[in-house]
Each structure stands twice: as structure tokens, then as C-alpha cells.
Amino acid sequence: MMLEHVLVLSAYLFSIGIYGLITSRNLVRALMCLELILNAVNLNFVTFSDFFDSRQLKGNIFSIFVIAIAAAEAAIGPAIVSAIYRNRKSTRINQSNLLNK
């Protein structure tokens, strides 16, 4: 694939994720959009690593770190959402003001 095609795909994924984060009122949907943004960043890391310096694996190593962080977020995020739902009976972002009380 050409570099431009992959960058356009990554920009679309990133834009959809940002749009979802801005407009989402649901915590689960916001977590999914955050994962989409992280995947777009991973795609950029791997693409630039392959295109500019194919012998070194710096971009691939960065993407492995981002995948590890995303896995931790995917494990902890739903647990936090579940705890908020048990306390507030809602997963809406504007109703989760746990620090105010």
C-alpha cells in the first residue's frame, strides 16, 4: 500500500474517534472511541516505521507499548464503568459526578 492511503485511513479512524469522544454521552461509547484513536496512532507508528526506516523496529516497539496500554485501559475501563453504573444507575458522562459528593 502507498503511504498516502494508510495515512488517510489513519486520519479517518482518528477523526471518527475524536468525533465520538466529543459527541458521546455514554461512557462505554467514549471508551470505544478512545480505543479507535489508539489504533489510529498504532497504524501511524507502524506505517512510518516501515516507510522511513525498515531495518529498525522503533515504530513497532512503540505500537506494542500502546497496545499494552490499550489492553490495560480495556481491562480497567469497563470495571470503572460498572462501578459507576452500580452507584449511579447510569452510564451517562454528565451524570457521573462522583467527586462532587
UniProtKB/Swiss-Prot annotation:
- EC number(s) in its UniProt entry? 7.1.1.-
Molecular function GO labels:
oxidoreductase activity, acting on NAD(P)H, quinone or similar compound as acceptor; quinone binding
- Its top-level enzyme class, in one word, is translocase
Entry keywords, A to Z: Chloroplast, Membrane, NAD, NADP, Plastid, Plastoquinone, Quinone, Thylakoid, Translocase, Transmembrane, Transmembrane helix, Transport
Q: What is this protein called?
A: NAD(P)H-quinone oxidoreductase subunit 4L, chloroplastic
Q: Which Gene3D superfamilies match?
A: 1.10.287.3510
GO biological process terms held by the UniProt record? ATP synthesis coupled electron transport; photosynthesis, light reaction
List the catalytic activities from the record.
Answer: a plastoquinone + NADH + (n+1) H(+)(in) = a plastoquinol + NAD(+) + n H(+)(out); a plastoquinone + NADPH + (n+1) H(+)(in) = a plastoquinol + NADP(+) + n H(+)(out)
Q: How does it assemble?
A: NDH is composed of at least 16 different subunits, 5 of which are encoded in the nucleus.
Q: Which GO terms describe its cellular component?
A: chloroplast thylakoid membrane; NADH dehydrogenase complex
Where is the protein localized? Plastid, Chloroplast thylakoid membrane
Please state which protein family the record places this protein in: Belongs to the complex I subunit 4L family.
Q: Give me the segments passing through the membrane.
A: 2-22, 32-52, 61-81
The source organism is Fagopyrum esculentum subsp. ancestrale
Bilayer disposition of the protein: Multi-pass membrane protein
- What does this gene product do? NDH shuttles electrons from NAD(P)H:plastoquinone, via FMN and iron-sulfur (Fe-S) centers, to quinones in the photosynthetic chain and possibly in a chloroplast respiratory chain. The immediate electron acceptor for the enzyme in this species is believed to be plastoquinone. Couples the redox reaction to proton translocation, and thus conserves the redox energy in a proton gradient.
UniProt key word Transmembrane: yes
